[in-house]
Curated annotation (Swiss-Prot):
This is ATP-dependent dethiobiotin synthetase BioD. Pathway: Cofactor biosynthesis; biotin biosynthesis; biotin from 7,8-diaminononanoate: step 1/2. PANTHER family: ATP-DEPENDENT DETHIOBIOTIN SYNTHETASE BIOD 2, DETHIOBIOTIN SYNTHETASE. It catalyses: (7R,8S)-7,8-diammoniononanoate + CO2 + ATP = (4R,5S)-dethiobiotin + ADP + phosphate + 3 H(+); (7R,8S)-8-amino-7-(carboxyamino)nonanoate + ATP = (4R,5S)-dethiobiotin + ADP + phosphate + H(+). One of its GO terms (cellular component) is cytosol. The active site is at residue 39. Homodimer.
Amino acid sequence: MNSLLITGTDTGAGKTIVTSALAAYWHKYYPSQRLGVIKLLQTGIGDHEHYQAMFAGQESVEVVCPLRFTTPVAPPIAAERENQPIPLEIVWKSLVSLQKSCDFVLAEGLGGLGSPVTWELTVADLAGEWRLPTVLVVPVKLGAIAQAVANVALARQTQVNLKGIILSCSHPLSPQELSDWAPMDLIQSLTGVPVLGVIPYLETIKDLDQLAKSASHLDLEPLISLDCRTQFLG
């Protein structure tokens, strides 16, 4: 499947930074390939507007957000307050449409893997039911190891096709802090999921070159299929 879901351990884990870095990387190195960026569902103002500004005027990048609520809280609560349904079929149709029209699609989830999408479903449920290849963003901080272990367990329970873990730094860190708080070998050993690298702290997420450079240090091979890599390189 020519798509990748970027989810995290929690709200503020670094999903938007990682999605932006991956999008900037593909836009820079594969400019002839069409890239789709979709925020599956948004409450309040934020990520969708960021991606629109980031790729304004770029015909090779399509940015969509099929379902939005004004209230910046969990979707089932926002929908209830606004007296609106949560028609996930609209989200699914938008995703499928992007998959058909683009060479690769980056889909950013909402909140964390366990965050509610409806009163019955979480992000993990959608990722599993929709069979989306998924990467888990784990913020580098005290408690990162436990968060990674718990979220990988949830991913397995809901049959998420988890391709790897990406660590994200929300503030400047020393090598010692990175090693102490999010040791890659230990996280891999406990979860059985490869840690694909670290996105360092970035002062801005509007610099496409800086974003692409940060993604270039990741092990990107597990995140796209052989067909997509052949297409990109062809």
